[in-house]
């Protein structure tokens, strides 16, 4: 078996466990909101910050590929995929691909929300 898959799987298990833990530790009341997904919100922001650090370190070859697979793909992938979304957007902006970046941001948010709504509708009405 290729160890790359093992590293990604182990990191994913750790990241998913961390996401669950952070979600359980956060209150549901936040600022003026009676019910706010603070756990998910926090995980996404933490993941974006950490992938920014790791993305730069990876570009500078501070750590090896196996650790990158374990931590970036595995841990952060299990913790939040929003962090990858943030990194992909930043890379487009750094390459001055502004139309692509705007399309990616708007498309991901709008089509993602539509996908959630369609899935919800189908599950509600047909399952």
UniProtKB/Swiss-Prot annotation:
Keyword terms: Cell inner membrane, Cell membrane, Ion channel, Ion transport, Membrane, Metal-binding, Sodium, Transmembrane, Transmembrane helix, Transport
Single GO MF descriptor: fluoride channel activity
Keyword field contains Cell inner membrane: yes
The organism of origin for this protein: Helicobacter acinonychis (strain Sheeba)
Activity modulation: Na(+) is not transported, but it plays an essential structural role and its presence is essential for fluoride channel function.
Reaction catalysed by this enzyme: fluoride(in) = fluoride(out)
Stated family: Belongs to the fluoride channel Fluc/FEX (TC 1.A.43) family.
Disulfide bonds: none
Protein name: Fluoride-specific ion channel FluC
Membrane-topology descriptor: Multi-pass membrane protein
Protein's UniProt keywords contain Membrane: yes
The encoding gene: fluC
Transmembrane segments: 3-23, 38-58, 67-87, 102-122
Pfam families, alphabetized: CRCB (PF02537)
Location in the cell: Cell inner membrane
Role played: Fluoride-specific ion channel. Important for reducing fluoride concentration in the cell, thus reducing its toxicity.
Signal peptide: none
Record-level GO cellular component terms: plasma membrane
């Amino acid at each position: 078996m290729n160890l790359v898959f093992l590293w990604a799987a182990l990191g994913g298990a750790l990241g998913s466990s961390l996401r669950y833990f952070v979600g359980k530790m956060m209150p549901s009341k936040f600022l003026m909101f009676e019910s706010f997904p603070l756990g998910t919100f926090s995980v996404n922001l933490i993941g974006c910050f950490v992938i920014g650090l790791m993305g730069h370190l990876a570009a500078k070859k501070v750590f090896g590929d196996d650790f990158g697979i374990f931590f970036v793909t595995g841990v952060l992938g299990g913790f939040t995929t929003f962090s990858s979304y943030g990194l992909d957007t930043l890379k487009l902006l750094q390459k001055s691909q502004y139309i692509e970046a705007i399309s990616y941001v708007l498309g991901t948010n709008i089509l993602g929300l539509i996908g959630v709504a369609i899935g919800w509708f189908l599950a509600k009405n047909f399952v």
